[in-house]
A protein has these predicted regions:
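ATP-dependent adenylate-forming carboxylate-activation enzymes
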Residues: 1-8, 22-27, 149-170, 180
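Conserved adenylate-forming
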Residues: 68-81, 85-127, 139, 149, ...
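Conserved AMP-binding/adenylation subdomain of ANL enzymes
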Residues: 106-125, 135-174, 188
């Protein structure tokens, strides 16, 4: 997104507090004068790594939660209550906001976890190489939490070597990300003669994966590359190419 689009989204959504990754602090500083209703900024770090920022009323995340109780009484409310607001990208004109309910989020998590899609269970280990700002990381953090799966979140380094190091250390069986991430991973695997012994499925979205990449995952690493398609308006998953008996017999 362009800076002008980010400014539009923040103002249109009437955001009051922004949670910012360290890598975006300078960008938000350049936008602050145009942000109409923002009261403060929470930078996702601890006190030792807090940057010297020009942002008004900025605090680090660890300070924010340090004074809060570890106990939380979850309130009762209608399932159609709003849970999150995601904005489209790549559409004509300004981004459009899509408001999700708690009901739609839970139903989407059930669908993503089903046997014909991600097959999420309490024994799963999932590495979503896709950020929450990309349509709630395709809903997989909710699905993983719902079924008690292990979730492994990458940092800002998404090069092939860094992604492989996470895979080697944490042993995920399910990966999720856009094709460019998997191309970088395959390049690293070829250069270092490594394999993906623990991985069963890699879900790819955002754009179509090249046929050669699909074949290389399957033939060299025995990893099924599953295509997912959807839109922001669909929470976002609409359909996925699950492995069929006919495919296995080919």
């Amino acid at each position: 997104l362009f800076p002008e689009q980010l400014t539009y989204i923040i103002n249109h959504a009437e955001n009051q507090y922004l949670f910012i990754d360290l890598s975006f602090v300078e960008l938000v500083e350049s936008l602050e004068s145009d942000l109409e209703g923002v009261k403060g900024y929470v930078i996702l770090t601890d006190k030792d790594n807090m940057p010297d920022t020009k942002l008004n009323n900025a605090m680090c995340y660890e300070d924010l939660i340090s004074g809060e109780s570890e106990e939380f009484d979850w309130p009762e409310f209608d399932e159609n209550t709003a849970s999150s607001l995601c904005y489209t990208s790549g559409t004509t004109g300004n981004p459009k906001g899509v408001l999700y309910s708690h009901r739609s989020t839970i139903l989407h998590a059930w669908i993503v976890s089903s046997g014909n899609v991600a097959k999420v269970s309490s024994s799963s280990c999932i590495l979503p190489v896709v950020p929450m700002f990309h349509v709630n990381a395709w809903g997989i953090p909710y699905a993983g939490a719902m079924f008690g799966a292990k979730l492994v979140f990458p940092g800002p380094a998404l090069d092939g070597a860094s992604v492989y190091e996470l895979i080697d250390n944490e042993k995920p069986d399910l990966l999720m990300g856009v094709p460019t991430v998997w191309l970088g991973l395959l390049q690293h695997l070829n250069e270092t003669n490594q394999t993906l012994d623990c991985v069963e499925t890699a879900l790819v979205g955002g754009s179509a994966a090249p046929r050669a990449m699909i074949q290389e995952f399957e033939e060299k690493h025995d990893v099924f590359l599953m295509h997912g398609w959807g839109m922001t308006e669909m929470s976002p998953l609409g359909t996925a190419t699950s492995r069929t008996k006919e495919m296995e017999d080919m």
